Curated annotation (Swiss-Prot):
Domain of life: Bacteria
Any Pfam family matching the protein: Arginosuc_synth
The entry's keywords: Amino-acid biosynthesis, Arginine biosynthesis, ATP-binding, Cytoplasm, Ligase, Nucleotide-binding
Name by which UniProt lists this protein: Argininosuccinate synthase
EC number: 6.3.4.5
Keyword match Iron: no
A biological process term (GO) from this entry: L-arginine biosynthetic process
GO MF term (any one): ATP binding
GO terms for cellular component: cytoplasm
Catalytic function, reaction form: L-citrulline + L-aspartate + ATP = 2-(N(omega)-L-arginino)succinate + AMP + diphosphate + H(+)
Gene: argG
Amino acid sequence: MTTILPNLPTGQKVGIAFSGGLDTSAALLWMRQKGAVPYAYTANLGQPDEPDYDEIPRRAMQYGAEAARLVDCRAQLVAEGIAALQAGAFHISTAGLTYFNTTPIGRAVTGTMLVAAMKEDGVNIWGDGSTFKGNDIERFYRYGLLTNPDLKIYKPWLDQTFIDELGGRAEMSEYMRQAGFDYKMSAEKAYSTDSNMLGATHEAKDLELLSAGIRIVQPIMGVAFWQDSVQIKAEEVTVRFEEGQPVALNGVEYADPVELLLEANRIGGRHGLGMSDQIENRIIEAKSRGIYEAPGLALLFIAYERLVTGIHNEDTIEQYRENGRKLGRLLYQGRWFDPQAIMLRETAQRWVARAITGEVTLELRRGNDYSLLNTESANLTYAPERLSMEKVENAPFTPADRIGQLTMRNLDIVDTREKLFTYVKTGLLAPSAGSALPQIKDGKK
């Protein structure tokens, strides 16, 4: 049995994730006038471009909501963001610049907390503003049904009647005006922006063209560091972790992780840290392009990774990164609370993050230009005296020890030469004078 309703369920309670923007405002009013009983739910995610959250539910009531609730999701959002950081759950990167999955994390929190609030009100039909081409329609679908197995989905943007009557922003604005609401469309930007306190996503419209770059974006969490007119002074910042949790910035301890992240955003944002331009594969395997901001998470992640590399051994780091990529993809797909994701996340939190205690000092400059100045931790396994080029007392190994270790390597070197010779005999390899490959013709060098 399908859980998606193609037409408006008149006479029934319908919950809508209400942002207060034109789309959801027109949809709420339209649903009320067509005979549904709309309930509005707004997630407070600490969006940097939202000036007044308390006003949003009031507007929803004006547009016909039976009830309107503001759900504070900030603490849970930051908790999930730090969990993703601890596990390195980021699979999209370009030349070392990372997308911190800030929108997928936000959807995991919104999709569960709003549906839980609806369930408390006896609302078992949910609508939101996601379109059929994007990732969010599937993310919200999964999280909604995980939270409420009796949930039905109604999306105005999948209802042909709604599309025929209010198919565009101009039509929506006129509809609101005729209903007596002086709702003026905001000025059209050259791209679309979605944000929460973890980060911002800029995409669509002009940004669908790869010839349009970061220079057309006006950052909402930082500064346009690519503009020479923007003055940015170098700044030193110290980040402290205790058992994987960020607890202090520049010596100031924060009992509330939300306040710590806000300060990290302010520090990183002054430099434009954490902005990246990514081409990615959506859930449906079509490629899309986005420009992202995440100044606070970027700052914390740099410090966290520095401590990871100084504390853990190579095999642990390799496993952490492999699992992090897998977990990042699951998060992106809307599977953050699936069993395989929980297994990967909790493994990293237990065996990687719990050892991460220490301080890292950085110098931030413009954009993603920074230097690591100092790393301190009681758990460091980095010990410079082990490999010092100077003469040291009680050296951990001697020249004779290294001779023995190198001699043992003869076994795999001989094996490698024999395999290369086999490849030459079968024609897979053809060494030439200009090749860096050893000149193996008869099994001898």
